[in-house]
């Protein structure tokens, strides 16, 4: 993950939505519609690059399996929601 790509990805989402989605990967919280739409607008490549970066950290590595699954499910749910808004 190049630092330029990473920086561009992080700028594509508000800090509130970034926090909401981060917490979702570890806990049963709801991701609101606004954040879902921001996620899809950010793009799949950015989302999964950022998620992979989180779970490559020793601090979060133990939660990688469930977190990666939750992030994939979230992406799919948000993509469906975004299609409904097109």
List each model region and its residues.
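Mature extracellular/luminal domains of secreted and GPI-anchored eukaryotic proteins, especially small
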Residues: 1-86
């Amino acid at each position: 993950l190049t630092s330029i790509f990473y920086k561009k990805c992080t700028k594509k989402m508000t800090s509130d939505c970034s926090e909401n989605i981060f917490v979702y990967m570890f806990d049963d919280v709801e991701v609101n519609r606004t954040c879902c739409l921001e996620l899809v607008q950010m793009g799949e490549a950015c989302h999964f690059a950022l998620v992979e970066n989180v779970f490559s950290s020793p601090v979060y590595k133990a939660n990688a399996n469930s977190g990666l699954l939750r992030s994939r499910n979230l992406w799919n749910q948000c993509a469906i929601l975004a299609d409904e808004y097109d």
